[in-house]
Amino acid sequence: MTPSTQDKKLWGGRFAEATDGLVELFNASVGFDQRLAEQDIRGSLAHVAMLGQVGILTSEEVTQISDGLGAVLADIRAGTFEWRLDREDVHMNVEAALRDRIGPVAGKLHTARSRNDQVAVDFRLFTKEAALDLADKTRALRAVMLAEAEKHLAAEVILPGYTHLQVAQPILLAHWFMAYVAMLERDEGRFRDAAERMDESPLGSSALAGTPWPIDRHATATALGFARPTANSLDGVGSRDFALEFLSACAILSAHLSRLSEELIVYSTFEFGFLTLPDSHTTGSSIMPQKKNPDVSELARAKAGRVFGNLMGLLTVVKGTPLAYNKDLQEDKEGVFDSYDTLSIVLRLYTEMLPRTVWHAEVTRAAAARGYSTATDVADFLARQGVPFREAHEVVGGLVGLASRSGRQLWDLTDSELRAAHPLLGAEVAQALTVEQSVRARQSFGGTAPARVSEAIAQAREALG
């Protein structure tokens, strides 16, 4: 980027002194908002076309400005554009380059427009596109998770289900995958809902109060792919709730991906041994030759924190800004850019990694059988015989204590020990003690029984289309 050369500012008419160099450095946003160059030029092309349609500019002026903008865009795409710090931001850089290329007629581009509505429309365009792109990437991961659920349902792979990270009850591995499918479906929906709400163009709001020029805001909104213009000019230039909603959706998705990351990290440890992550998505140690580190999942878990921080940062920025535009709002973009970039790569990595992850069914089944995971099934067995569930719970709790003190599992207890705990317990309860029967018994809607999981997969497959 070219440093300041103290050219005359496009807004410099009322100023008698040049901008202080440190102020210029502090004030400039072109280092990051140049990312909006494509959106900025699209907005300008729509604006100048509308100015011609309503008779504010001649057709020759429209053509000259439009061709000039096209040439500037070509330079940007080619990487030959000279971004200058003294021109502050993407808008002034583009307009100054246009002026250098086509002369004073470039100044007519800004008729009936302010940088306030210009940046608002640029940022909305970017954020709307980012929301829809993350929705698509979330959908792709959802499809991968669904395929994994289908694969593991066919083999009826059993996994221990946990509460408090203690073995709770056996579940199907497919049921575990479907839990994340459900989360990702809501995540995708949040991005699409946010994109629909931000589908309004602030272009034409001007500085804050609208403009006396006879512009057609509906025309520019349509040209830019928006459903409608914003209904209030103050709101159009002064609100950033669309960015907050986007960041909120990012934060919730990040929380889900962080939970997934934590489970994959734990399940891949030597102590658990439930799965093996692919070599392509793990790393080694500089000193310990045996190490295979889950860096992708660890970074995905950690990066959730920066996404949360981006949301909190923007909330803190906007909470004290009066209507309408304030320079504070320059701080709205980097967090959105960063969250979008972060989630884009995490979603892609998991979409690649999960199908290559190997689950060890014999290990997960053995783990599911430990920790007295079928104790609730024994209590249910008694309850079906008419024993009040709380009494059954007390009886089985005593059996668990007996087995635990003697280093045994429930199925190791003798018939006499079972009947001593309750006369309705005996050899026939053994069937309730298997993890397979425990899983099959959970037939309630949304449960882990194979038939219920199969239904959930079918519904999820239909929802994906």
Curated annotation (Swiss-Prot):
Catalytic activity field = 2-(N(omega)-L-arginino)succinate = fumarate + L-arginine
Q: Which UniProt keywords apply?
A: Amino-acid biosynthesis, Arginine biosynthesis, Cytoplasm, Lyase
List the Gene3D superfamilies. Fumarase/aspartase (C-terminal domain), Fumarase/aspartase (Central domain), Fumarase/aspartase (N-terminal domain)
Gene Ontology cellular-component terms listed: cytosol
Any one GO molecular function term: argininosuccinate lyase activity
Q: Name one GO biological process term.
A: L-arginine biosynthetic process
Localization recorded for this chain is: Cytoplasm
Q: Which SUPFAM superfamilies match?
A: L-aspartase-like
Q: Magnesium: is it a keyword of this entry? A: no
- Give the main location: cytoplasm
Name the InterPro entries for this protein: Arg_succ_lyase_C (IPR029419), Argininosuccinate_lyase (IPR009049), Fumarase/histidase_N (IPR024083), Fumarate_lyase_CS (IPR020557), Fumarate_lyase_fam (IPR000362), Fumarate_lyase_N (IPR022761), L-Aspartase-like (IPR008948)
Output the Pfam families linked to this UniProt entry: ASL_C2, Lyase_1
EC number(s) on record?
4.3.2.1
Pathways per UniProt = Amino-acid biosynthesis; L-arginine biosynthesis; L-arginine from L-ornithine and carbamoyl phosphate: step 3/3
- Similarity annotation: Belongs to the lyase 1 family. Argininosuccinate lyase subfamily.
Protein name stated in the entry: Argininosuccinate lyase
**Record lineage:** Bacteria, Thermotogati, Deinococcota, Deinococci, Deinococcales
